[in-house]
Regions:
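Generic secondary-structure signature for well-ordered alpha-helical cores
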Residues: 22-25, 67-72, 104
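FAD-binding core/adjacent interface of flavoenzyme oxidoreductases
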Residues: 1-5, 28, 73-133
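Substrate-binding N-lobe of the ribokinase-like
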Residues: 53-85
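Short N-terminal micro-motifs specific to bacterial/archaeal maturation
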Residues: 49-50, 69, 93
Length: 133
């Protein structure tokens, strides 16, 4: 049985997995996309990247680090979670997993707006960043 299944393979999910693994927990990460960080064009205020890094590359680096630590990261969609007295049963279209705990790290979806030019200007003046906005 898995100690913790993390649903969501964005920055929060992968970071949680890395920390749990450091505490010798058996961890599995399941998710379909890379979260909001994937759409970030350039991160220039993060330690260790003097010329910046794009969000997709940063999250891929995190996934690589997690896999290097022995964490399985699956590209699947969770369709159901059941709780028995003994464990959680997490179901995807192709698998069922048993875990002692489940951590939901699916993030917050950005609400699209229907404004001409909006998509084209994302990352080029329109941003979703607390310190940028």
């Amino acid at each position: 049985m898995i100690d913790t299944i993390i649903i969501g393979k964005g920055a929060a999910g992968i970071t949680a997995a890395i920390y749990l693994k450091r505490y010798n927990k058996n961890v599995l990460v399941i998710g379909k996309d890379l979260g909001a960080l994937e759409k970030t064009v350039k991160i220039e205020n993060y330690y260790g990247f003097p010329t910046g890094i794009d969000g997709k590359e940063l999250i891929q680096n995190g996934i690589t680090q997690a896999k290097h630590l022995g964490i399985d990261v699956y590209d699947e969609e969770v369709v159901q979670i059941d709780n028995t007295l003994e464990y959680f049963l997490v179901t995807t279209p192709n698998h069922e997993y048993k875990a002692k705990t489940v951590l939901i790290a699916t993030g917050k979806k950005r609400s699209p707006i229907n404004v001409k030019g909006f998509k084209h200007l994302q990352g080029k003046g329109i941003s979703f960043c607390v310190t940028c906005d």
